[in-house]
């Protein structure tokens, strides 16, 4: 119910950014998530020694500070005359999802988002299981690996993206990011030594180029006063993939790691994700080559 922060942040970025800067600015959201993955476990682990509930109190305090800052300090992104009036009929998940049908120009990219986010659950849903099963890691090493990936995400989306997208453009950056992501997923599927996790995390993290580039292309083709609703539709779409993705990836991992399976292959979810992402890349290339989108 309270999961609209990312949607609102994305809409805010779209409102205040010029078309040329949208993709780079969307990358800042990814960079913030990366820093969160680094700092969050450290803070939580430190506070946890004072009681299992203390990290939750701290998280509530941070959220409250965020609320105060947003309400009293952060300026409104649109002038009053440019805002659309509130309509209760459109303020529901189904209506928001159905609102995406008003944007046929970007349907191909929406398919790409669905495929890409299903593929992401190869790591979101099975990461701990994968590294523990495949490399015999303990909780500490799992945490280190997540922190390392968070650091790479912050570097890519907070820094590299500001160099690469202006130089290559959003479309080529999208293709480049998806290619790196596919390569990273495939490499993880065949990884059999612990050090490979840190090496293969580099191309996987460079895949972070594609998300902001994709967001930048789509938002450039949406009216300014519909950015919030559009971002809500995207979030609803991603939420649906968060139902399907974990079911597929966790069951696949179980099938290829339990004693009854004919083949032992803990990297199976990553291989499937590489195939799904390849389909997403094919869809994106074919669609963008035929469309007249503003990029």
Question: For the regions a protein language model found, what residue spans apply to each?
Answer:
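Cytoplasmic helix-loop-helix junction between adjacent transmembrane helices
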Residues: 1-34
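Helix-loop-helix hairpin linking two adjacent transmembrane segments in secondary transporters
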Residues: 29-72
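A membrane-interface helix-boundary motif in multi-pass transporters
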Residues: 48-61, 251-277
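Multi-pass alpha-helical transporter architecture, strongest
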Residues: 67-73, 271-295
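Juxtamembrane intracellular "pre-TM" segments in multi-pass secondary transporters
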Residues: 75-112, 133-134
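Short amphipathic helix-loop junctions that connect adjacent transmembrane helices
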Residues: 125-142
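Helix-to-loop junctions at the C-terminal end of transmembrane segments
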Residues: 156-170
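C-terminal transmembrane helical hairpin of 12-TM major facilitator-type secondary transporters
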Residues: 171-214
